[in-house]
């Protein structure tokens, strides 16, 4: 009985060791991510067109017309704004 328990413990240890070795060798833990703190408005608009995840229609989301701001939100007006560099862009806003 004691021999079976020790064999079972060794088998579990071996499986855990093999799994952690394979995961480490696959390079998942070595993945590097580069992020920007302030994304320029042009890239934000591109993100909005390519990845439309805004189902609820949040405030300050990029838009091109009022129809882009529809959803379950109070901010249903697309308003033009200017950033600190003088570039103009449009976001969903509470007031027209």
From Swiss-Prot:
Q: Where, by tissue, is this protein expressed? A: Fruit specific.
Q: Does the keyword 4Fe-4S apply?
A: no
Highest rank taxon of the organism: Eukaryota
Cysteines paired by S-S bonds = 59-75, 63-78, 69-92
Q: Which UniProt keywords apply?
A: Disulfide bond, Knottin
- Tell me the Pfam families matching this sequence: CarbpepA_inh
Q: What else is known?
A: This protein is sulfur-rich (Met and Cys rich).
Q: What is known of its domains?
A: The presence of a 'disulfide through disulfide knot' structurally defines this protein as a knottin.
What name does the UniProt record give this protein?
Fruit-specific protein
Q: Source species, please?
A: Solanum lycopersicum (Tomato)
């Amino acid at each position: 009985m004691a021999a079976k328990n020790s064999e079972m413990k060794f088998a579990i240890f071996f499986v855990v060791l093999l799994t952690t070795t394979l995961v480490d060798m696959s390079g998942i833990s070595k993945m590097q991510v580069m992020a920007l703190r302030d994304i320029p408005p042009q890239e934000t608009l591109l993100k909005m067109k390519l990845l439309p995840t805004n189902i609820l229609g949040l405030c300050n989301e990029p838009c091109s017309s009022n129809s882009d701001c529809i959803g379950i939100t109070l901010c249903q007006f697309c308003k033009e704004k200017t950033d600190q560099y003088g570039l103009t862009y449009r976001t969903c806003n509470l007031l027209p």
